[in-house]
Design a protein with these regions (language model features):
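Nucleotidyltransferase catalytic core that binds NTPs
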Residues: 1-184
Length: 184
């Protein structure tokens, strides 16, 4: 049987409960068999660089997994594939590196990012290699997106210290101990 792997890339600056809700929903509904979280190295289409460095964002993803329910956390892993890549981060390069014959790959993406997919590097090739699971943003009316009761949490608001309750306990502790985002 072919394994269905969800590739969930993002800046994760920081990873928050909205991201984790998507993970739990995809796995508990058996839409995918496992998920790989991939913090972006240098996202090409972002206007600003991530605030936290790659190692901190990678660690926050690992910590967030520990706070997931038993039975879910075992199906989630974190990859440093993009953090360790020099230069801009492109989804196609990640998929080509992760491509496995015994697996069907699904790129998990927000509806806002998916609306710009044709601007991605080698987008047509990417579309041939993966299926997309499009996640609706709160307040969006995108009918093509998967119906997940998404949480209205923003990494920007977390960084501005407005919603530290929007991250998992282990991630909150990490942010506070390292004083991440404190000056923002």
């Amino acid at each position: 049987m072919v394994s269905r792997i969800g590739i969930y890339g993002g800046t994760f600056d920081p990873i928050h409960n909205g991201h984790l809700r998507v993970v739990v929903e995809l796995l508990s509904r058996k839409i995918v068999d496992s998920i790989i979280l991939i913090p972006a190295g240098q996202p090409r289409l972002r206007s600003e660089a991530p605030v936290a460095d790659g190692k901190a964002r990678l660690e926050m993803c690992k910590l967030a997994i520990q706070d997931l329910p038993t039975g879910i956390r075992e199906q989630v892993s974190v990859s440093d594939i993009e953090i360790n890549r020099n230069g801009p981060t492109y989804a196609i390069d990640t998929i080509l590196e992760l491509n496995r014959q015994e697996a069907e790959l699904f790129w998990v993406i927000g509806s806002d990012a998916y609306s710009n997919i044709d601007h991605w590097h080698r987008a047509s090739e990417l579309k041939e290699l993966v299926s997309f699971i499009v996640i609706d943003r709160p307040g969006s009316d995108d009918e093509s997106a998967l119906d997940i009761d998404a949480l209205d949490i923003s990494a920007t608001r977390v960084r501005q210290d407005q919603e530290l309750n929007g991250v998992s306990p282990s991630v909150r502790k990490f942010i506070l101990e390292r004083k991440l985002y404190a000056s923002k």
